[in-house]
Amino acid sequence: MIHSHNNNLSFCSQLITVRKMAALTRALPAPLHTSTTEYEEVPAPLPATPGPQLPKYGQRKGWKPKTAADFNGGGAYPECHVAQYPLDMGKKNKGQGSTLALQVDQDGLVRYDAIAQHGRAPGSRVQSSFKDLVPLANRTDVTESERQMERPDDLSVAETAERTRLALERITHGKIKAAQPKHVPKTNSDATYIRYTPANQSADEGKQRIIKMTEVQEDPLEPPRFKHKKIPRGPAEPPPPVLQSPPRAATAQDQKDWMIPPCISNWKNNKGYTIPLDKRLAADGRGLQDVHINDNFAKFSESLYIADRHIREEVRARAQLQQLLAQKQKTSKEEELRLLAQRAREDRSGLSSSVSGSVAAASASRLPAETGINLGGYGSESGSEEESDEEEEDEEAIRERNIVREEKRREREKEMRMSNMGSEMRAKMLAKEANRDISEKIALGLAKPSASKETLLDSRLFNREALSTGFASEDSYNLYDKPLFAGSSAAAAIYRPAGSSRNDESFGGGTEEGIKEEMSKDRFQLGNATRGFEGAEGVEAREGPVQFEKDTIVALDGSADPFGVEQFMDAARRGGKRTAEDRDEERRKRARDE
């Protein structure tokens, strides 16, 4: 109530004042001149620069305050687990570093001589370039005044001497101060004068004294009078509360993760303990690394498997082809022998030559063309030659017939050699003749063709494996694992018994008595003896040298024992007890001695 009354009084007083000012304005005359008031232009306030955008509370994960503006005049953020220095508190000021800035010369090249000039006096000169080794008389970057090397004037000499004297004094004063005692308190030897007026004015009125105050001289070697006592430490602050989860039992995986392997040395074992292999590997730390297997191993294995399968298929097809060729060769040989036997029977029976010639020609037409076997001209062609011999006795015809006979004799020798070969060697020879390189043939009457790159390479050597270095490894025990003349015709030529007939007496010389003698022998094994040694009738014929079998000594566990160590140890363990084998050996020795 009182407060509202006071407000009404103040409002009335203001209204009266306004009315008095209006009455005074009406009483005053009008002004003759209008005046303009000049106001200073107040500059507009600059727009406030926006401060850094600080993330709100709860959204500061991963945010790092770096500048002083990030703290916004406040303290550190406890939810940011990084080093923070609000208002640069606790931040160590780094001194001036010794790192040199990269400098370049007028050509833009790096000045490496700045390292040699670092830390020296400003006027000192360091010779750090190649031009410093060149005499001044031969240098082009030096002026004539620098070459003359004039003496300095008296003023520069005096300045240098004064600068040297001051430097020596600083060094001397430093040495003297280092020898003086330290921590000596400085005393003020000046006396202080004090005007003293006594307070009791009744005794001596207006009597004043002048007192001189000086400090008492102290002995610098006097021991300290007071002893500093350490204040006992106050009670410790209560530890901050830490929210902890309730204790739980450790699982096997937790115990395995927290397991620290024992420290086992790979070089020392002074006590000679037997350390298990798993403990040693655990101390090595290799179990902490994950093993990553490259996918290329699987790809490589798959490629090898596919290549092996293709090669096996090719080898199987090649073997089938060789078997087929051998079968055809065998069939042709049997047909040839059958024709020879039929011709011999016809000759003995006295049949006409025309009938035998027609039969021989018909049989020769049935022979397979791919075998390339010739019957030696026992057909109608030979009969025609005999008739021509009877009709014409010309020397030229005789010479031609001799040439034909020589060619046929060579063919018969080749057929005989092929008949004595095995099926495998015959198939190899046929395959070799089928795959002959024809680049060596020369076309007669034509220009020599230019050699191409394809003819310079022998395709028969592409799939052959080269010999390894040294022909065998050091630890191999297979020095005689292959026969001496394996797969070659040399063995058949060396170990074949020499025939009694010469080249001109093949097939009995072409006479009836010779053919009968040849047919009386074993017709299916041409070139072999009809009679051998006693007891060798059931032995199969060999086409090469005698092959011996390798004695392999087998240990008790089934592995190879080339030196007989296991047998020696077994005999030693038995302690010299004689076995049945030893008794048999001794019995054989006695029988031999008797």
UniProtKB/Swiss-Prot annotation:
Gene Ontology CC terms: spliceosomal complex
Keywords tagged on the record: mRNA processing, mRNA splicing, Nucleus, Spliceosome
Composition skew (Basic and acidic residues), residue ranges: 398-417, 513-523, 578-594
The keyword ATP-binding is annotated on this UniProt entry: no
Biased composition (Acidic residues): 383-397
Comp. bias regions, Pro residues: 44-53, 235-244
Region (Disordered): 36-63, 223-254, 370-426, 498-523, 566-594
The UniProt record lists the keyword Nucleus: yes
Cell compartments where the protein resides: Nucleus
Entry's Gene Ontology BP terms: mRNA splicing, via spliceosome
Function as written in the Swiss-Prot or TrEMBL entry: Involved in pre-mRNA splicing.
Family note: Belongs to the SNW family.
SUBUNIT field: Associated with the spliceosome.
Entry protein name: Pre-mRNA-processing protein 45
